[in-house]
Each structure stands twice: as C-alpha cells, then as structure tokens.
Amino acid sequence: MVKLRLKRMGSKFNAFYRIVAADARAPRDGRFIEELGYYNPFSKDLKIEKELVFKWLDLGAKPTETTKTLFKKEKIMEQYHQKRQKN
C-alpha cells in the first residue's frame, strides 16, 4: 500500500519535512516513490503540488493523519472530493 506521509529532513532541533508518496513498508526517512511538496514547521512554509497529490489519491494512496491535516489547511481534500463528484 502507498501512503502519503512526511519524511524528516534537516538537522537536530531544526527539522523540516518533505511530503512524499512511499510504500507503507519503507522506513520513515527511507525510500520513497515521489516527492509531493515540503513543510517547514518553524517558518510555517508549506508547498504542495496539488496535481501530484490528486494523482496519488486517484491511485489509492492513503494520507497519514498529519498529511491529511496539512492537506485540509490548503483545502486539497475539499478540492479532490469536488473533482471526484464532477466525474
């Protein structure tokens, strides 16, 4: 199963995260399939490639709770559900 989750990057006490599509069996900071964006909790900087997220959700990927919260902040889940209802 593919999950949309955060991959921890940066140094000790100065972490930032990449939003990635990864196999659920892979380690948190290990191998991933595709990078979808990034999130920096210190500067509150968030960038997400919406079209890539929509592609992975269509393919059946499951977002983790944390990534789902970030997607809701950017209204990505709402846009995805509206897009699916149109089709």
From Swiss-Prot:
Pfam families: Ribosomal_S16
A molecular function GO annotation: structural constituent of ribosome
Official protein name in the record: Small ribosomal subunit protein bS16
HAMAP family attached to this UniProt entry: Ribosomal_bS16 (MF_00385)
Lineage: Bacteria, Bacillati, Mycoplasmatota, Mycoplasmoidales, Metamycoplasmataceae
SUPFAM superfamilies linked: Ribosomal protein S16 (SSF54565)
GO cellular component: cytoplasm; small ribosomal subunit
Family: Belongs to the bacterial ribosomal protein bS16 family.
Species whose genome carries this gene: Mycoplasma mobile (strain ATCC 43663 / 163K / NCTC 11711) (Mesomycoplasma mobile)
Example GO BP: translation
Keyword tags: Ribonucleoprotein, Ribosomal protein
Matches recorded under NCBIfam families: S16 (TIGR00002)
